[in-house]
């Protein structure tokens, strides 16, 4: 198999995994956090699910792009 496809499949698996992890963390944060006010004055479930979780996953997406994704040529070598 062409190494471009191996890398593309690896990147797709990581993206799907991070997406499913985000969904799981969001659900846990939204439904298991309390309703007591948090440090911003919003309910704790809102702070966890809508403020802290997205910030965490922005960092994880940055790390995934920095360390997992690679620049690969998209043109087909056989077409030239």
Curated annotation (Swiss-Prot):
Please report the record's description of how this protein sits within the membrane: Multi-pass membrane protein
Task: Summarize induction of expression.
Answer: Down-regulated by cystine.
Annotated InterPro entries: DUF997
Q: What is its main location?
A: membrane
Q: Which residues form a coiled coil?
A: none
Sorted UniProt keywords = Cell membrane, Membrane, Transmembrane, Transmembrane helix
Which GO CC annotations does the UniProt entry carry? Answer: plasma membrane
The superkingdom listed in its UniProt entry is Bacteria
- Give the transmembrane ranges: 15-35, 45-65
Where it sits in the cell: the answer is: Cell membrane
State the similarity comment.
To H.influenzae HI_0974B.
Q: Specify the protein name.
A: Uncharacterized membrane protein YhdT
Protein source organism = Escherichia coli (strain K12)
Gene name of the record: yhdT
